[in-house]
């Protein structure tokens, strides 16, 4: 059933309770998303798909109400889950400096990306953002709360940040997801990740979009899209500057501003992992699950996407 319609995507609630986003083929690489054959000039989804519509796929054609299109890729976007708890601390510090320099140069100045320089100064020089930048200040508060290790302070930080911003995935949520990617991959912040999952489960639907709530839960569980995973590999494996630049540029192209905001979060997560204070308060044993995350198998029943009409034998 359709539960949210935007210009370039609509959201579908499947029987398992999972949300899948169906996109115009514009290069989005969000976990739990698939692409249609439509292009940028295609008819906006909100002109032809409506809340509550049934959705199904049969013979490679996606249909909803009076709308139908051929699928360009009938699989979910590739997803990964990986932990590298023994990453070299010196390499991590060196790579995060390189990452910060490249992000400052190539990040998009949209959404919270407009405050990219201020965010980097906060992370590396402890210069607090001005009160006028409310979302950035809230993110800085959450960063310090995670570093403190105090549960109630972290909850207060989540209350200030989750859902802050506009769009399919609000800016603050994208930054939090990026933090989660770094913390999980480098075996840190297990208690924060667990707390975030519990918080989103209890309050997410009232504080942010349904899609963003799902992305927060996936990120807290270590699930990331392929471009972000490749970027994390560059940081962990001491990749040369040219390689990191190419990988970063692919990551920041995600969405209007989400790619840059995810990278801002990844940088913050790396800073939490690499500082001595963070090692005393937020680093715990790495997650047990590691390796490629077979989201297609888990959510798509042998890679058949969106089996959403159990009453229709054509969909079985």
Regions found by a protein language model. Name each.
Residues 304:
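Cationic, low-complexity basic patches in intrinsically disordered or flexible, solvent-exposed regions
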Residues 110-123, 127-147, 155-215:
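Hydrophobic, aromatic-lined core segments that form the binding pocket/scaffold
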Residues 228, 240-294, 309, 316:
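Acidic, carboxylate-rich catalytic segments that either coordinate divalent cations
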Residues 184-185, 190-238, 244-254:
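Accessory, usually C-terminal, subdomains that scaffold auxiliary metal cofactors
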Residues 146-152, 235-242:
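Short helix-adjacent coil turns
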Residues 1-139, 172, 245:
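Phosphate/adenylate-binding glycine loop and adjacent helical scaffold
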